[in-house]
Regions:
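Acidic-glycine-rich active-site phosphate/pyrophosphate-binding loop
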Residues: 253-269
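Short loop/edge segments at beta-strand edges and connector loops
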Residues: 51-53, 90-92, 136-138, 219-221, ...
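Gly/Ser/Thr-rich loops at beta-strand to alpha-helix junctions
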Residues: 9-11, 71-72, 113-114, 224, ...
Length: 447
């Protein structure tokens, strides 16, 4: 079989291409921007890449074109495919049909923590001799790659709710048919494709309706949104947990920053975790990962030992530099809840030392202004906050809600202010779901 992948350098599509090549399928593809590290990963797997979407690059003997969700009508390659009647399929459907068939799919979903939990579960399984397959939309420091076919029936996939393709507006995870599903949390996000939280709930409900009666849903029982989705119709087994109450499966932090915590079932302690991750969101991720692995048959002691050695995921409280008593961090947080827990975790770790937060309003939901009223409370743990936005109305709203928020329209504007800031014993954290114009290194070069 010979496939051609459109949008091949994206994390998901690039991982899919690697899996297909590992399966013995002949793979090539194209993308608008061909850049490291994905281009080198693909080339090392014998996958040829064309830059741009020139229809002339489409192999004449291709059996199937796999279309990424960044591809829209009007793309010259898509128009060529439609005009000539060439067979095409979405990435998630291809994955389901050709790579996940007869696998025990373990889907990690939710608004936050998908990459971290997927990485944790994969690490624990591999550490315990389970050669699982996996596809993760981020780079875990404990794993050699972001995707592997594996030989065991278990396949771990980061299952997001974003739409499948221009011709299939259902969420990607609809295609995966998991036997084990974690919904770690559920809030409004992706304002570019969802108009309300109800729209997102419908997609999660569609996912639950496709699960068999022998499948298992793992979820935090204190999350009202998830419970409301279940009330719409739920037919599988459930394994609830919580971080708010001391009943059933739950966790108790031992240290204020949650870098040490114990896991209980009712009143009986089952495991103790001591790791480098911090924050209550990390505690919940750890508890969820533990229960996913427990449901797959692993022993508590083995799970705890592996999780305690978890090194983390790139762009999750990543210390990118430590210079002149200033620590500079990079973090992917771009939703008020994730921002809040990230900054609270850092505050509990560093005590009274100064925290400066740089927040780029980059995601579609953040740019829409939907979260403007929540941002001031989310960043309250920081001493000083610089919001990067060019929306004057948004800036006015944010500055009026908090005395420690200051606006910057560009990274250069902030860098000009840098020399006037008191930086001794400071933790400077940059929050964005993009590259932030390389501001982390620019700061380190100037201090």
């Amino acid at each position: 079989m010979k496939i051609y992948v459109l949008g091949i350098c994206g994390t998901f599509m690039g991982g899919l291409a690697q899996l297909a090549a590992e399966k013995g399928i002949k793979v090539s593809g194209c993308d608008e921007n061909v850049y490291p590290p994905m281009d080198q990963v693909l080339l090392s797997n014998g996958i040829a890449i064309d830059e741009g979407y020139n229809p002339k690059n489409l192999p004449k003997d291709v059996d199937l074109v796999v279309v990424g969700n960044v591809i829209a009508r009007g793309n010259p390659m898509i128009e060529e495919i439609l005009n000539k009647g060439i067979d095409f399929i979405s990435g998630p459907e291809f994955l389901s049909k050709y790579l996940l068939a007869k696998r025990h799919v373990v889907a990690i979903s939710g608004t936050h923590g998908k990459t971290s939990v997927s990485s944790m579960v994969t690490k624990v399984l591999l550490d315990n001799g389970v050669d699982c397959g996996y596809l993760i939309a981020g780079r875990a420091k404990d794993l050699e790659a972001t995707a592997s076919l594996g030989t065991h029936e278990f396949f771990i996939i980061e299952a997001d709710e974003y739409d499948t393709a221009f011709f299939d507006k259902r969420s990607k995870f609809i295609h995966y048919h998991p036997k084990t599903l974690l919904i770690n949390n559920l809030e409004f996000d992706h304002a570019d494709i969802f108009s309300s939280l109800s729209d997102i709930k419908k997609q999660f409900h569609h996912l639950l309706r496709l699960m068999s009666s022998t499948s298992t849903l793992i979820f935090p029982e204190h999350n009202i949104n998830i419970k409301n989705v279940m009330k719409m119709g739920f037919y599988s087994q459930s394994l609830p947990f919580n971080t708010k109450f001391t009943r059933g499966w739950h966790a108790k932090k031992v240290t204020a920053d949650s870098s040490k915590f114990d896991i209980y079932k009712d009143n009986k302690k089952k495991a103790s975790i001591s790791w480098s991750s911090i924050g209550e969101h990390s505690l919940q991720n750890g508890l969820a990962s533990y229960l996913v692995c427990k449901s797959l048959g692993l022993k508590s002691k083995d799970i705890a030992e592996s999780l305690s050695e978890f090194k983390g995921v790139t762009r999750r409280m990543d210390l990118v530099g430590d210079k002149s008593s200033v620590k500079v961090y990079d973090d992917f947080a771009h939703h008020p809840t994730a921002i809040k827990y990230t900054l609270e975790g850092l505050r509990k770790k560093v005590g009274s030392e100064k925290i400066i937060c740089l927040l780029e309003m980059r995601s579609n939901t953040m740019l829409s202004g939907y979260h403007d009223k929540k941002i001031p409370k989310a960043v309250a743990s920081a001493d000083q906050v610089f919001i990067f936005s060019k929306d004057k109305k948004q800036i006015s709203t944010l500055e009026s809600e908090s005395n420690n928020i200051e606006a910057c329209s560009t990274t250069q504007e902030f860098l000009r202010k840098l020399s006037s800031l008191e930086l001794e014993n400071t933790h400077l954290i940059c929050l964005s779901n993009g590259s932030f114009d390389g501001i982390h290194q620019a700061i380190l070069e100037r201090i």
